[in-house]
């Protein structure tokens, strides 16, 4: 996904982010004060959205990378890569101004699998919605930031 979707998008539209080694790594951190102001895509678009939005607001120097060593990621089945790509592309389109809140939030993706004597069509409905920034949600500021899985008495783990 990184080499076929993310890296070409960064090269074409966000060359200042071309130095990012693993833009879709799944292992990243961000300060809450920055993240709570971002619109957050559902699914696989969240990483590239956070990367692009951070760069847009704070500049490329606000992004640091750390080598965490060798990571073994579970490989996805070939037919699941299409929906993942749709979510990444939709997140980028929104940041380029090509997708708005009025656009469809579910995209029908037609895929074809080889079967004896031809192909079989399958339609997957891919969610490309985005959640509003947390700071725009009524009551966010007054909410407690202690997760319910933390014990209030001793701050120990309940899990």
What would you call each of these model-derived segments?
Residues 1-4, 30, 45-49, 83:
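Charged, alpha-helix-enriched surfaces in structured cytosolic catalytic cores
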Residues 64-80:
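Active-site donor/metal-binding and catalytic loop motifs
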Residues 42, 52-69:
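Catalytic donor-sugar/metal-binding loop of nucleotide-sugar-dependent glycosyltransferases
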Residues 1-34:
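Acceptor/aglycone-binding surface of glycosyltransferases and processive sugar-polymer synthases
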Residues 37-51:
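Donor nucleotide-sugar recognition loop
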Residues 8-12, 16, 57, 65, ...:
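Conserved, well-folded catalytic cores of nucleic-acid-processing
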Residues 76-159:
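Terminal low-complexity segments of carbohydrate-biosynthetic enzymes
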């Amino acid at each position: 996904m990184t080499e076929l979707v993310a890296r070409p998008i960064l090269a074409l539209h966000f060359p200042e982010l071309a130095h990012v080694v693993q833009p879709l790594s799944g292992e990243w951190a961000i300060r809450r004060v920055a993240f709570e102001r971002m619109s957050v895509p559902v699914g696989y678009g969240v990483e590239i959205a956070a990367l692009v939005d951070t760069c847009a607001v704070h500049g490329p120097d606000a992004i640091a990378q750390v080598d965490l060593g060798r990571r073994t990621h579970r490989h996805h089945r070939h037919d699941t890569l299409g929906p993942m790509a749709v979510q990444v592309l939709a997140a980028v389109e929104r940041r380029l101004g090509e997708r708005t809140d009025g656009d469809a939030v579910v995209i029908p993706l037609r895929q074809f699998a080889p079967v004896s004597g031809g192909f079989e069509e399958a339609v997957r409905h891919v969610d490309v919605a985005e959640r509003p920034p947390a700071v725009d949600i009524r009551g966010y500021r007054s909410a407690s930031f202690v997760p319910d899985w933390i014990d209030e008495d001793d701050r120990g783990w309940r899990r």
